[in-house]
Amino acid sequence: MHGDEPASIELVRGFVVKECAHAVALLPVANPDGAKRGTRYNARGIDPNRNFGFNWREDSIEPAGPEAWSEPESRALRDFIAAWRPAKIIALHWALGEIDADGVQSTALAEVMWAAMNEAERRPYRLRVTELGRGQRRLERIDAECPGSLGQWAGYGLVYLDDSQPSMITLELPFDPALPRPDSLGDEHLSVVQQRWQQDPRGYLDGVRPGVEKMLRAAIDFVPSVPL
């Protein structure tokens, strides 16, 4: 989604889907303008991940556009999802080191992804789920943190015609794959990890790829329960 997060793009491009019983769509780049320019924003200076039509806010910290769905990137993803109706959606970002379950229906998928890793691979992440009483960090709602995001729309606002909702995971890659996730990360965390990326991108990818690929394969195999 964000062009200044190249690690997420490279990991998706390098991921090989092995034989499975489910259709899988991989979209390495959802913001072509941002990817080309190495910026979070599209050519109009808007953050596409603040432009989705759920909990959209004009006064978002990041520029959200004049109205929800004003940007071609958010509309393209909306239309793609509406056509495919995926049961599971995983969006990769960089580099808060989190597995965010957007919506109560997403808790089980987040926990399956967490369980797919070994202890060392989990260290740079934290698990965040909406359902109270489960996970490392318990939250009722996270609407205020990322208004108008893909996770907000797909996890809370999107309901298919059969009344089902997709399991929506926002997977934030680690700040440092060799260290436990810090309790807090300052606003400068992305610039720091970008500098490290410029120095040794392969080292970073080699450090995170095993855990990420285990999570993605577990997610592909996971079958969400159907509400009665």
Where are these regions (language model features)?
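Active-site/substrate-binding loop(s) of hydrolase catalytic cores
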Residues: 1-119
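A generic signature of intrinsically disordered, low-complexity regions enriched in glycine/proline
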Residues: 37, 51-55, 59, 135, ...
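Short glycine/proline- and acidic residue-enriched helix-loop micro-motifs
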Residues: 56-67, 131, 183, 189-199
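Active-site-proximal helix/loop segments of hydrolytic enzymes
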Residues: 72, 78, 84, 94-170
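Surface-exposed helix-capping loop/turn segments at secondary-structure junctions
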Residues: 84-87, 123-127, 220-228
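Active-site-adjacent mobile loop/cap segments within catalytic or ligand-binding domains
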Residues: 98-102, 143-228
